[in-house]
From Swiss-Prot:
It is found in: Cytoplasm. Transmembrane segments: none annotated. It comes from the Eukaryota. Belongs to the small heat shock protein (HSP20) family. SUPFAM superfamilies: HSP20-like chaperones. Forms oligomeric structures. Residues 48-161 form the sHSP domain. This is 18.3 kDa class I heat shock protein. The lineage of its organism: Eukaryota, Viridiplantae, Streptophyta, Embryophyta, Tracheophyta. Keywords: Cytoplasm, Stress response.
Amino acid sequence: MSLIPNNWFNTGRRSNIFDPFSLDEIWDPFFGLPSTLSTVPRSETAAETAAFANARIDWKETPEAHVFKADLPGVKKEEVKVEVEDGNVLRISGQRAREKEEKNDTWHRVERSSGQFMRKFRLPENAKVDQVKAGMENGVLTVTVPKNEAPKPQVKAINVY
């Protein structure tokens, strides 16, 4: 039995007196105040823009390169920019325009997202930023950043007397 009721502070999660993090709301000076985000008027396209703005990008490292893959369905390669800024920051950006609406059309559902996106990645020191390559195929952007070869350790033989 908990000494603190389940609906205390209306957080939706069960409080546990033995869990030091379950009572964090007590010490939060802003807890219970209305969120400013909830009072901001949202356009009808805000949700779809947010979905596209958070373009998901995978980053893997192989022995030869850093490889970035982004799912960008419906985006043309002309609408995507891949840049290296400040010497070691990879910037991937672009936009997908919203379809032109005809006055006689009635939309029953709009689930495809549109809008702008931009993601930045700080590249490691071993990246060859002057040899970055990018390609787009079937709505997937692939950016390859080659790596410098790791310096081979120099071995010096020591004579034993």
